[in-house]
Each structure stands twice: as structure tokens, then as C-alpha cells.
């Protein structure tokens, strides 16, 4: 194992930061390639970055009783590679047993399969997607990562292992008993808070009689390290059309969203881009050759709502498009400026348009960090119930105008879930932006919403979780962590403060 452990030198600097542009520290780093290596590293080390990107094998395939294909993979499998292999119906089968090879033959003869979870970052690894319960644009129709995971292996802090299969272990009320690979029984007391009835990735997933596997999905790496996943595939839609609708005001776009949701039966995604986001794209198209292929935006286009339709055939898609057009006209949208993508080439152009926004913002923040390294991007991840969409958009607009901060917003308006990104120019902007986010967290909570809908709370927004659930819920969550990680060494600072965790460790933890 010693060859796997490396000192954390400047060579590995990129592994000490994430897309928030925040940085951390570590004494060492490793790139394990097997589950056994992960378990050995966990048993011995702290102050360590454990990178599972080289655990990227496909382990097997089976069909369940309903005929659905279930694919076992390691956590380092990259989403974009999985998509390519599924579309080509060619999976790497080295080391598969006979049952998996037989299922693979059926897979090749079956209609094309796909994995519906669709985060913007297609270079994401499946293990990381499970750790934060990723979702993305298609979550409007397909939900987040959680329901598409049927099995997990989770390496614990002491090197032991949990092998979890959906439908096999359930909580009794808020108490969960789990048996490890070594034969130990873990008795876990789950926090007592009630999760909001909105899109939510805030803190641990807990509910009465819950499936044990759901606790570890979205736990941000604080309870264990995912070393294996089993994911459920679905038959790919026969027809996919993308429709970009443009409006001259935000109010019209919100009205369109509220009106179109009950009308469309086959919408997979309803996405949003505000005036700030569109202006960034206009500048990038003019200034950078990398973005020259972006379609030109009409000067009158102030905001955009993108709708993706997943249909059984073109007749169904045409009917959905007719209903969408009727709502667009009623809401005051610009029918003459609408983009409709019916081919893969056109859809790829729209996909580039959608993904270019967050990429452009990250580039802008990187440029500003050269002047002030203390700043990072500030991106909200909050959601509210359907009835409060107009209210939360009005909250964002009013408070941003009062603050004078530069911003750009985009995201999953179909789920009432916008990413409002504040673009600080200096430390003062950064501080004011953080204060504004804290205000939003309180007001969104009062609306019955969630402070994090898909990214997970992580470190930067850990304080918002206490705003949402209260201090006692944080204590209960930290105690749950310590029942699985007694020294508090996994994902320190994620979800709750290191100070709270260390105080509980000193008092005997759980």
C-alpha cells in the first residue's frame, strides 16, 4: 500500500480545490485502484486526500424482475464515458462473470439504454455524483441520482465495509441497524428533523422507515467512501426535442413556467437563464474563439427558458410543441425568436449554450482571483415549493438590486431551483454576497424550501443547514456521523462545523 500514498506536493495542487474555487490542505494523497486499497488507506490515515478517479472499472450487469438493466461500476467511472458506451451498446466486460455476460448479450439486443441523471458537468464521476446526490436539468422528469442507485459499497473510516442493496435494510422509525462485512452490527440513531417537500440535498436524507442505502447517497463523503455503485438504466427516449423560449421580462418567463408545467406531459427539463447570464454569453461569443459557435442572441432577448421534450415518437413531440407554443403566446413570449432543436446537431448546439454559462462564470472568477485570491464564486442552490416561485425570484431581484452586486442566474426553474451566482470583484463584494446568501437561506426556509437542492451543503454553506433545521438537528447529525466515523476524520467541515464535531468527540462522540 505504501506505493499508493504520496506526499501532497505542488504537483497535486489541483486536487486541493473544487469548482467553488475554494482550496484546502492535506499532508498526503492517494489514487487507489481497488476497494481493498481504499479500506487499507482509511484504516491508517487522516489529513489525506483519497482520490478514487482511477477506480473506473465496469464490474457487471444484471436484469431485475421487471427486466430493468442494473450496471455495477466503480466510483471513478466518468459520466460522459458512460453515456458514450451506452449509446454505442459497448461496455468493457473484462473480468465479468457468466451471468453478467449473458445479461450483456440481452443489453446489446435491447432498445438503447441511458442513465438519466444529467448534471451540467459531464466529466463528473459517478461516485461523486452519488456522494452529493447530483441531479441537473433532467431532474424535472427523472429526479436526482438517489432513485437510480440500487446498490452501494461504502468503506467506513476504520476500513470495514457496508454492502447495501436497495430494498433489503430499513429503519425502524428513526433507528437503523446495519451489519458490516466483518460481521459487526452498527446501531444508528437518525436525526429527527423533517425534510422539506421540495427538491432537496440539504444534510442527511432521513425519514421514518427509510431504506438504509438512502442515508449514504448525498452524505457528501462524511459517513464513508463509496467504492462501488449499482445504477439502474432506462430505455432511451425515441425522440428528444429542445425548445429555447425567449422573453423580454423575467415576470413573463416565470408566468410561462407556472403555466407550462401542468400542460406538458413529456417535459424532461425546464431550465432558465436570466439577463446577466445571457449578457455573459454575448461577451464570450465576441471575445473568445472558444465560444464563437454559440448562436447569436437577439438584442431583445432578456431571459430564456429552455424546455426539453422526451417523447415516444414525433407525433407526440409535435403535439407537445403545439401546447408549449400556445402557452408561450399566452405568457407574452417571442414566438418568432424561439429555437427548436429536432436533430442531434441542433441539440448539441443548445447543450453547448447551456453549459457555456457556468463555464464562463468560472473563467471570470479565475480571472478576478488573480487580483484578489481570497474571493470565490458564490452560487446559490436553493429551492422552494411550486407556489413560491414568483416570490423567491422577486426576493432575489429586490435584494440584488439593493446590494448593487453583479450576478448571473440560471438553473432548474421547473423545480423552482435557480442558481443565483454573485460575481464578487473584491473581498468586500464577497463578504456582502455571503451576507445576502444568509438572508436568502432564512427566507427560503420560511417559504418551506431547501438551502441546497442538488449540490449538497459542503463546507461553504454549512451554516445554512443550521438555519434550515436548527442547532439540535446539527448535533444529532454530527452524532450520527460519529457512530460511523468515531474520530470525525471523513469530510471534515462538510455539513456542520469542525468545532461542533470536535466538541462531541471530546465528550465521547455518539
Model-flagged regions — what are they?
Residues 217-219, 225-434, 443, 447:
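C-terminal substrate-recognition/cap domain of FAD-linked oxidoreductases
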Residues 40, 44-45, 86, 96, ...:
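A generic structural signal for well-ordered alpha-helical segments
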Residues 438-476, 480:
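C-terminal structured "cap/appendage" subdomains that terminate the fold
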Amino acid at each position: 500500500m505504501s506505493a499508493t500514498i504520496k506526499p501532497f506536493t505542488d504537483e497535486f495542487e489541483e486536487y486541493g480545490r473544487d469548482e467553488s474555487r475554494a482550496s484546502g490542505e492535506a499532508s498526503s494523497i492517494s489514487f487507489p485502484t481497488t476497494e481493498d486499497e481504499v479500506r487499507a488507506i482509511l484504516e491508517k490515515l487522516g489529513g489525506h486526500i483519497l482520490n478514487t478517479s482511477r477506480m473506473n472499472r465496469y464490474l457487471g450487469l444484471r436484469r431485475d424482475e421487471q427486466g430493468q438493466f442494473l450496471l455495477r461500476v466503480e466510483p471513478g467511472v466518468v459520466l460522459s464515458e458512460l453515456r458514450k458506451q451506452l449509446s454505442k451498446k459497448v461496455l468493457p466486460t473484462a473480468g465479468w462473470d457468466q451471468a453478467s455476460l449473458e445479461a450483456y448479450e440481452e443489453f446489446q439486443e435491447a432498445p438503447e439504454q441511458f442513465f438519466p441523471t444529467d448534471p451540467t458537468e459531464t466529466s463528473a464521476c459517478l461516485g461523486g455524483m452519488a456522494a452529493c446526490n447530483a441531479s441537473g436539468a433532467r431532474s424535472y422528469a427523472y429526479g436526482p441520482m438517489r432513485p437510480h442507485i440500487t446498490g452501494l459499497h461504502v468503506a467506513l473510516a476504520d476500513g470495514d465495509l457496508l454492502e447495501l442493496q436497495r430494498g433489503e435494510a430499513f429503519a425502524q422509525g428513526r433507528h437503523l441497524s446495519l451489519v458490516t462485512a466483518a460481521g459487526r452490527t452498527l446501531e444508528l440513531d437518525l436525526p429527527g428533523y423533517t425534510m422539506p417537500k421540495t427538491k432537496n440535498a440539504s444534510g442527511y436524507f432521513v425519514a421514518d422507515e427509510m431504506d438504509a442505502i438512502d442515508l449514504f447517497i448525498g452524505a457528501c463523503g462524511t459517513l464513508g467512501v463509496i467504492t462501488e455503485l449499482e445504477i439502474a438504466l432506462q430505455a432511451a427516449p425515441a425522440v428528444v426535442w429542445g425548445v429555447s423560449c425567449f422573453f423580454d421580462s423575467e415576470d413573463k418567463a416565470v408566468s410561462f413556467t407556472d403555466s407550462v408545467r401542468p400542460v406538458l406531459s413529456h417535459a424532461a427539463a425546464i431550465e432558465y437563464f436570466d439577463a446577466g447570464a445571457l449578457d455573459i454569453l454575448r461577451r464570450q461569443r465576441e471575445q473568445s474563439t472558444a465560444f464563437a459557435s454559440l448562436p447569436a442572441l437577439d438584442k431583445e432577448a432578456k431571459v430564456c427558458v429552455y424546455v426539453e421534450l422526451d417523447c415516444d415518437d414525433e407525433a407526440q413531440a409535435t403535439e407537445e410543441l403545439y401546447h408549449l407554443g400556445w402557452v408561450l403566446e399566452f405568457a407574452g413570449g417571442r414566438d418568432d425568436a424561439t429555437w427548436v432543436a429536432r436533430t442531434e446537431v441542433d441539440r448539441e448546439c443548445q447543450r453547448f449554450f447551456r453549459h457555456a454559462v457556468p463555464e464562463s462564470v468560472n473563467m471570470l472568477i479565475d480571472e478576478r482571483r488573480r487580483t484578489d485570491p481570497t474571493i470565490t464564486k458564490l452560487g446559490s442552490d436553493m429551492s422552494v415549493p411550486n407556489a413560491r416561485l414568483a416570490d423567491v425570484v422577486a426576493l432575489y431581484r429586490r435584494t440584488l438590486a439593493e446590494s448593487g452586486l453583479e450576478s448571473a442566474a440560471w438553473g432548474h426553474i421547473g423545480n423552482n431551483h435557480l442558481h443565483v451566482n454573485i460575481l464578487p470583484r473584491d473581498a468586500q463584494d464577497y463578504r456582502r454576497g455571503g451576507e445576502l446568501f444568509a438572508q436568502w437561506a432564512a427566507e427560503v426556509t420560511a417559504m418551506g424550501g431547501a438551502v441546497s437542492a442538488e449540490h449538497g451543503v459542503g463546507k461553504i454553506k454549512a451554516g445554512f443547514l443550521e438555519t434550515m433545521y436548527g442547532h439540535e438537528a446539527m448535533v444529532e447529525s454530527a452524532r450520527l456521523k460519529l457512530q460511523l466515523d468515531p474520530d470525525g476524520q471523513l469530510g471534515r467541515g462538510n455539513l456542520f462545523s469542525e468545532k461542533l464535531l470536535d466538541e462531541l468527540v471530546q465528550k465521547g462522540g455518539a
